[in-house]
Amino acid sequence: MLNRLCPRLVPSPLFGFSLANLARLDPEVVCGIVYGGMDEVCVLAINELSRWWFSLSRDRCSACGSRASEIDEDWRYCVEGDAGIAVLEGLVQLCDECHLAKHLGYALTHGRFEEAIKRVAEVNNVSEELAKQVAEETFKVHGSLSKIRKWRVVLRGLSGLSEGVIKVVEYVLNFVMNNNYKLSNNYWLQYRGQNKSEIEERAENEALELLRSALGLEGKNSMRIVIELSGEDLGKLVNELANALNNYGIRVLKRETETALRLVRGSEHVRDNGRVGIKLGSMGGKWMVFVPSGLRGVVMRNVIDGLRERRLDYIVKTPGVREGGERPVIVYVPNFLAVGMVNDVVEVLLKVLNRLGVNKPLLFKPDVFTQEGIYSGKAGGMKPYIYMTSLRLKGFH
């Protein structure tokens, strides 16, 4: 029906998994995650993929014949039982307008759907009504395919890459796709575990226990209790928290911690209509450690493995792009008042760092500091974290 330019939507579980994205990632980070250590064959293969991808010519749009600006991956999707197979049949050159029309989901979320439909109709010499009918069917197919959770990637039609490189790239894509990794729009590699509810429930219960022991307060929602605390109670809570974490070798910055609790209770924000509203904060937070770029993937994978053994694999992330120097590995905790979990998570981190010979401080930053833009050097003397520890403080030798 549409012979020259046919829209095709990527199933939701496959978002972010592409040659284009993989070619932009740091091979040491990716291969460290996939293999749990440095794998030279993998690093060489990803480097070769990157060189090949960025050398591809962009001459003429295969749909309309104008100057091409994009290399589009021609993925086909099929279903085998309860699993899906994503087959890359090859690459096509597209101009900006035809590339937008090919990816209607992107066009829709960016307010350019009508523009994309007009392009589909124009290039295929059909009516806009017919183009919209095809688009409607495309979204229905996308909805069905997105319900499939298990996928396998098959790579074909990649002339210019050796079979060895294609085999490694295919393995890497299948590993990250089937092991709960995602690539965000700003190229963070992120892992999300499968027992989210269990971890959040444990964290909430631990926070409620701290509030009960520190202040004698009962309730079912730790955030609601914190919101209603008086200034005096905040001070008592911080002291109790400091005592509890100090017993684990974790230092608590009392001023910063009290600030975080006050921000959880809400901060004033000017809305789009000019009115001032109260924006509630989050009880979540994350441990951060800055490690050499060549070790980030290895650290991340080993930390995830350790957390999974203790059923604490919640959210872990690190920058995926090629960057020199030291960059963070970040491990999330659902509630920064969950004393036991805060300690258990950092214990896993420290064991991995100790095994790899990395001696760096670990800092815990509450999400409310991120929300309020409290970063190092920008907070008027306020540290951008509330807890810190290290191998020495934890008694590692």
Where on the chain are the PLM-derived regions?
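A boundary/linker detector
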Residues: M1-W52, R58, A68, G111-N180
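Histidine-centered nuclease catalytic patch
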Residues: W53-F54, R60-Q93, K102-T109
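Short microdomains enriched in Cys/His and/or Lys/Arg
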Residues: C78-D96, E114-L130
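Short active-site loop/helix that positions an aromatic residue
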Residues: E80-A83, R301-L307
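Short, conserved charged micro-motifs
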Residues: I85-A86, G294-R301, A338-D344
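Polybasic, proline/glycine-rich intrinsically disordered low-complexity segments
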Residues: N125, V176-K182, R308-H397
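Charge-rich, low-complexity segments
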Residues: K167-M283, E372-H397
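Short glycine-/aliphatic-rich beta-strand segments at the starts of folded cytosolic domains
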Residues: M283-V291
